[in-house]
A protein has these predicted regions:
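Conserved helix-turn-beta segment of the N-terminal RecA-like "Helicase ATP-binding" lobe
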Residues: 95, 99-124
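Conserved pre-motif I regulatory segment
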Residues: 34-70
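Walker A/P-loop
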Residues: 63-88, 93
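SF2 helicase catalytic motif II
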Residues: 135-185
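Conserved motor-coupling elements within RecA-like helicase/translocase cores
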Residues: 121-131, 146-147
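Hydrophobic positions in the central parallel beta-sheet of the AAA+
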Residues: 69, 94, 131-133, 152, ...
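Interdomain "pre-motor" coupling segment immediately N-terminal to P-loop NTPase/helicase cores
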Residues: 1-38
């Protein structure tokens, strides 16, 4: 309970648990935390998931659309993320460790979803229904924008454990979370 606002309060990353708990118990919930709605998306790329990609996505969905996908380099983790974005139909934030990866993600997301995409990082500060950010920019800005995304994708998620970066994950209330990596070793 937060005496300053006279209401219950908790860490942003527990948002999904609070909403789900209220729903399951039948308690009314006046959700003033989230600043996102459904985002109707179509996948414009003509490509089918490989069996292991479908298995990874299905396991992620079965786990409440939260979890990690660990696949070797070049095995299509980006495509799994595309399917996750398509499945959730919510504004998404994709966080990558370098500006080169941010630019690759940005180009790919615009191509496969046909929507305006934003960038946070490398001197650019634009939000879109799908936004791509560096880890450092996410750490700086998610305190302000963490309520705008229903899904957060952490590319090269082993970088998340670096000092100062875990705070970005904690202040993002996205109920759906996907970590992508080829290895948990940093």
């Amino acid at each position: 309970f937060d005496d300053r606002i006279k209401a219950p309060r908790g860490p942003a990353w527990r948002y999904a648990d609070v909403v789900l708990g209220a729903h399951r118990s039948g308690r009314p919930l006046d959700d003033q935390a989230k600043a996102f709605e459904k985002l109707p998306l179509e996948h414009l790329a003509e490509r089918q998931a490989r069996p292991y990609q479908r298995e990874a996505l299905d396991a992620w969905v079965a786990n409440g659309r939260r979890g990690a996908v660990i696949l070797p380099t070049g095995s299509g983790k980006t495509f799994v993320a595309e399917l996750a974005i398509l499945t959730t139909q919510r504004p998404a934030l994709i966080v990558a460790p370098t500006i080169d990866l941010v630019n690759q993600w940005h180009t790919r997301m615009r191509a496969v979803f046909g929507v305006a995409c934003g960038i946070l990082g490398g001197g650019v500060h634009e939000l879109g229904p799908i936004t791509v950010s560096t880890y450092d920019s996410a750490a700086l800005h998610l305190g302000r924008y963490g309520d705008r995304f229903g899904l957060v994708v952490w590319d090269e998620a082993h970088h998340l454990a670096a000092p100062g970066r875990i705070a970005a994950a904690e202040c993002c209330l996205a109920p759906f979370r996907l970590a992508l990596t080829a290895t948990w070793e940093r």
